[in-house]
Amino acid sequence: EPSQFILTGSSVLPEADETIHSGTGRYAYIKMRPMSLYESGESNGKVSLADLFDDKPFETQTNDLTIDDITYLTCRGGWPWATLISKEVALDQAFDYVDSVVNKDIQRVDGVKRSPERAKLLLRSYARNISQQVPLSTIRKDMLANDSSTLDEDTVTDYIKALKKLFVIEDLEAWNPNLRSKAAIRTTDTRHFVDPSIGTASLGLGPKDLINDLKSFGFFFEDMVVRDLRVYAEALDGKLYHYRDSTGLECDTVLHRRNGSYALMEVKLGGKDLIDEG
C-alpha cells in the first residue's frame, strides 16, 4: 500500500525546530543495521533462535567458512554495497566510512565543533578495547597516551555520545535479572561498534593482521556475533545484554525477550578447548 514506509537518512538528524511532527502515534521506528551474515548469504541459517526458544530439536551444524573467510567478513562488514563488489574494493568501504565519520559527520551531527584527530583516537581506543568491559577512565588514559593536550572524561563522554548518535558505537548494557542474589551486578557496558569493520578500519587492520593475532581476532569476532544477534533479537521482540557479577559469573550475551524468556550465549572463535571452556 502507498505510504507504508518512509525511508530517511541516519547520520545527521534534522534540527528540532525543523521537525513538523514527531511521529508519535503515527509512525513505528525501525533501526536499520548493517547486514547480518545470514542476510548477506554467508550464514546458512539452519539453526533458528526462535526454534531454540520453543525447545525444538536441532542437529549439530558445521560451517563451510574457513578462518580466512571469517577474517575477511569481519573486515568487510555488513555494508550492503560491500557484499556486491569484489573483495579488494569491498575492504575499502569501512575505511571510507571511518574517514567520513571523523572528518565530517562528527561535527555535523549536532553542530558542535570537534577534533577529527580526537575522534580517530577514540575509535582506535574503542577498537583496542572491543568486546571488553572497560570504564571511561581506561579509554581516556588510552587516548591520553597519544594526545599531548588535556583531555577530561566529560570530553570523552561528549565524543562517545556523538558517535552513538551517528550509529557508530553501540555498547552492550548489563543485564539485571532482579533475582534475590547477594552478588552485585557489574554495570560497566561492554564496548562495541555497530559493525566490526569499523574497529578493524580504525586500527588500519586487514584480514591477514587478524590471522596473525588470533587473540585480538577473537574480540573482533565477538563484536561481529553481537552485531548479528542484535538483528535476530529485534526480530524476536528482544534486546541483547551482557552479564557479570561480583562472584565472577559472567556471560557474553543475554537475549532477553519481552515475554520474559531469555537465552544465555557464550561466544568462542572455535577450537575444542575454547568451545569446552564456553
Language-model segments: which ranges?
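Sensor-1/coupling segment of RecA-like P-loop NTPase cores
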Residues: 2-19, 163
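Accessory nucleic acid-recognition modules appended to NTPase machines
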Residues: 83, 87-261
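Short, glycine/charged-enriched secondary-structure capping and boundary segments
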Residues: 19-24, 45-46, 206-208, 257, ...
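Active-site ExK catalytic segment of metal-dependent nucleases
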Residues: 263-272
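Short conserved micro-motifs at the rims of enzyme active sites and ligand-binding pockets
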Residues: 203-205, 266, 276-277
